[in-house]
Each structure stands twice: as structure tokens, then as C-alpha cells.
Swiss-Prot record:
It is found in: Cell membrane. Coiled coil: none annotated. One of its GO terms (cellular component) is plasma membrane. SUPFAM superfamilies: Concanavalin A-like lectins/glucanases. The chain crosses the membrane at residues 4-21, 33-55. It comes from Archaeoglobus fulgidus (strain ATCC 49558 / DSM 4304 / JCM 9628 / NBRC 100126 / VC-16). This is Uncharacterized protein AF_2291.
Amino acid sequence: MDTRLIAIATFVVTFGILIVLKRLNYIESWDTFSILSILAAVLTIAAYFFTLVLFPQDYDQLKKEILDEINESLKNYEIYFKCKDFKKPIVKDGAVRIDKCVVMATKLNLTDHGYIVDLKFRSNWMDSKGTHAILFIDGDDAQINLFEREGEIFYIIKSKNKISGVYIQLKSVKWFDEAFSDNWNNIKIMWDTSKDEIWLEINGIRVSKKLNFDFNLNDSVIYLGSNPLEDTYAEGYFDRIMVYKSADTADFGTPTVRRFE
């Protein structure tokens, strides 16, 4: 139990006992009652700080518990997301909130099927210090805010029930293909929800024409990739986008593939 709650409960019980003793005339004067009440408050505060020194809270353990809870809750979400509805927020437990529907590719995996990008979702949100958010996850009991500052990657974990503001510096981001290392913060998938159009931008320049889909992109999983059978594969270019339409992340279903033009 929280030490502060114990201290408050102790004072309330002590004060209640003093009131009972006064009503039973064991404490005759109000002056004596006032002095004893003040003494009880002082002793309670002293005991509270003594307890903090004698039994310090294990913040590392609490931090680990939060991380474990978050990792467990995120196992089933992979790169699943829902776009934010502007009439009301639509945020599934552990899912990613994308402000203005802008996401960022930050990690490249080289597979037998070509380059597959695990999307690290990005919003346009800037905090008071001007750092740019990379990932924001909002769950029932905790929030994760991953962001970049001066080339280093950090994340803050906030929990409603435990620690608020655990601030952790991550190891530097490693790219699987160094050819893409200069594109950090510069590759964006742009999505116009009103028209269900999606396109790719690098360094703010639109490098592909709009791609029209015959279904709503909500509840979709998006991959960027390249074809290992084409020359562009060796040069590390993205040449296609894959959209998995499924409401359940455990079953991605059949991908819809569109090439960049």
C-alpha cells in the first residue's frame, strides 16, 4: 500500500481516538485536545518520512513491472493501428494513435521476400521542448511515448496506478541497411482518409503517385517493401506497398499489393 495512504489513515484513526476520549471526558480541556491533535499530526508526518528512509520504494522493480505489463499487452498488436476519428477518439487497448494519420518507417528488415519495413508509428505531436514524437501507445493502464531528441531515442512510460514519468534512454537505432540510415525521420506514408488515398514521401518530396484502394483503410496493417527479383531491390528502393485488411491482428488475411508508380 502507498506510504502516504498509511500515514493519512494513521492520523485519521488517531484523531478519531482523541475525539472519543474527549467525549468520554478523559480529556477535560479543549486546549489539551488541541495540543494532542497537533502532536499526533507532527508524529504522523515524522513517521511517514522515517518510513520512506527506512523502507525506500523499489522504483526499478516497479519500472520492470510496468514494462512487463506493457510488453504483455502489446504482444497481440504488432503493427496494427486505427486512425484517429476526429469526431471521437478511437483507440484500442495497446493500439497506436496516429494524429492526422501520418506514420513513419524507421526499421528495415531484409527477408527472402524483399525489404519489409516494420512501421514505427509517428505523429505530428511536438512536446514543449520541441522534441518530435515517434510512437505513442495508449492503453488502459499505461502510456508509452517514444521520441527523438538530438539523435538519441527516449521513451517515457506513464502509469495511472504506479509510476508517472519513467524516463529511459534507448540504445541508438540500428538500421538493417545502412543505405537507409540517412532517411531517419524522412520517410512518411501519407494517408488521406477522406479519399482512401495513400502515397510515399521522402524528405518532404512526394515520390509516388496516389494509390487508390477499394476498401476503407481502417483496421489495416501496412507494409512497405521491395521486390527481390527487380534491380531496384539491390539499391534499397521501396517499390511497393502491402495493405493487410483485417480487424484481428492475429489473422492478417490476404494482402492487397499496390506498386508505386
